[in-house]
A protein has these predicted regions:
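Accessory cap/linker subdomain of secreted extracellular hydrolases
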Residues: 44-64, 68-71, 255-354
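Primarily recognizes the serine-hydrolase "nucleophile elbow" in alpha/beta-hydrolase
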Residues: 203-274
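C-terminal catalytic histidine-bearing segment of alpha/beta-hydrolase fold enzymes
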Residues: 333, 337-344, 348-351, 368-371, ...
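Short beta-strand/loop motif that positions the catalytic acidic residue
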Residues: 357, 362-369
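Catalytic-loop region of hydrolases
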Residues: 32-125
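Short beta-strand element of the alpha/beta-hydrolase
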Residues: 117-118, 127-139, 143-151, 249
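Alpha/beta-hydrolase active-site loop
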Residues: 161-165, 188-210
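Secretory targeting and sorting signals
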Residues: 1-33
Length: 431
């Protein structure tokens, strides 16, 4: 078996030591796909140069995957724009790797380009199970998104950990789709947009004929920031992409209520994870510049912090924001209770989304997690249960957000394997 008891132990130790799961091959030759999908030459090299941190917008992908085609608006969500064959990501089982650009929508229903990476075992049979794995991207920079980060060590909190999830899937003969779920603006916390990117990435995976995955079953998985994208995708699936065959989703450590997340991290008191709350605010500003002009309410320290975070990954965001508070970086709090602010937060909080996840859900968290509202998470799961969704919740014995990822990993993946196998779905819905 791929994960021996010793390897499981090493994984848990490594994950906790590295901040616990906030959750080399040569360059391949491009393979032509049937028209009308253009296949680009393989991108030279697998590293990304350092990017400046003193500018506002996210730095774009240095390749051409995110380039908008002239006919983007006429394409359907999930239609493939272009694809490129890529080398195997670091520390993963050798596999066939593709990056696929596709049409998707932003939060306002406008067309944009999404990107997903798909790994499949060599010489795989058609229509194998596929896991859509939403990486732990609590970030502001395009270099932190999977299309780049799987080839670098830019985000040392997530990058050593995520390959374990990739390898678990590949070792079982599954494919794995890894979307850039923060979109082309790297709009962290724009959860509704992220869910749409995930679903359209699955559509693109089934429509790209060289992969032979047209009739595949899909499961979703993600922790922390990746869990928000996973939760949004599973919640929106029935209305946004009802034809997508999702057999289940795994949510880990998911902040389901952005307002409560901000309150937990605090406005008056300094907090070691304040950087995540500020990054979420700035990410929402990128997606909703008119409704949330956050930058105009920042003082000099806030603007300096914003510049330092502009293209930062998780570890950098945590370092820049360590010990700060909203009181320290804001000129005023006029926006906090503004109707526009509350509306945007509600639109991007899974707890207040009117849609209901229909596919089974496995949800796990630490009962004493200081970064999420467990009360909101439990209420969301109860609402799904009342609507008939089969939910299994696991309250791990982990004391906080980081170590809970390691503790919940294996039971979550075994649950997922059972969904692909068509076994009866357990549920511990209550109340």
């Amino acid at each position: 078996m791929f994960f021996s008891p010793r390897r499981r132990h090493l994984f848990v130790v490594l994950t906790v030591m590295l901040g616990g799961a906030l959750a080399f091959g040569t360059v391949g030759t491009a393979v032509a796909a049937p028209p009308p999908v253009p296949v680009l030459p393989a991108l030279p090299g697998v590293t990304t140069p350092p990017l400046p941190t003193n500018i506002g917008p996210s730095v774009s992908d240095p390749g051409s995957l995110y380039r908008h085609p002239a006919d983007l608006a006429s394409m359907a969500p999930g239609d493939v724009i272009r694809a490129v064959k890529r080398p195997n990501p670091f520390r993963t089982i050798p596999s066939e790797a593709w990056q696929i650009a596709f049409r998707t929508n932003n939060s306002h229903g406008k067309p944009m380009v999404g990107v997903t990476m798909v790994l499949v075992p060599f010489n795989h049979r058609a229509d194998i199970p596929v896991l859509s794995y939403q990486m732990i991207i609590n970030a502001m920079g395009m270099r932190c998104q999977p299309s780049q980060s799987v080839y670098t060590t830019t985000d040392w909190i997530a990058s050593p950990v995520d390959p374990w999830g990739f390898n678990f899937a590949l070792a079982r003969g599954w494919g794995i789709a890894i979307p850039d779920h923060l979109g082309e603006k790297t709009a962290y916390a724009a959860v509704r947009m992220s869910g749409q990117v995930v679903l359209d990435g699955i559509r693109a995976t089934t429509r790209f004929s060289p992969l032979r995955l047209r009739k595949s079953k899909f499961a979703l998985s993600g922790y922390s920031g990746g869990g928000m994208a996973t939760g949004a995708a599973s919640t929106l699936q029935a209305t946004y992409a009802p034809e997508v065959n999702i057999v289940g989703s795994v949510w880990g450590g998911v902040p389901t209520n952005l307002t409560q997340m901000a309150e937990v991290i605090g406005t008056d008191n300094s907090h070691p994870a304040f950087g995540l709350a500020m990054a979420a605010s700035l990410g929402l500003e990128r997606e909703y510049p008119k409704e949330l002009p956050i930058s105009s309410h920042l003082n000099w320290l806030g603007l300096q912090t914003r510049a330092q975070m502009a293209n930062a990954c998780t570890n950098e965001i945590l370092a820049v924001g360590f010990g700060k508070s909203a009181q320290m970086v804001a000129k005023n709090f006029d926006m906090l209770n503004a109707p526009e602010t509350r509306k945007v937060l509600a639109l991007n909080s899974i707890a207040s989304m009117p849609e209901i996840a229909k596919a089974p859900v496995f949800e796990f968290h630490s009962p004493t997690d200081p970064l999420i509202s467990v009360k909101s998470l439990d209420a969301t799961m109860k609402r799904y249960c009342r609507a008939g969704t089969k939910v299994y919740q696991l309250s791990t014995p982990a004391p906080e957000h980081l170590s809970a990822a390691a503790v919940g990993f294996f039971p979550a993946y075994e649950w997922m394997a059972d969904r692909f196998a068509g076994k009866p779905v357990p549920s511990n819905c209550r109340g």
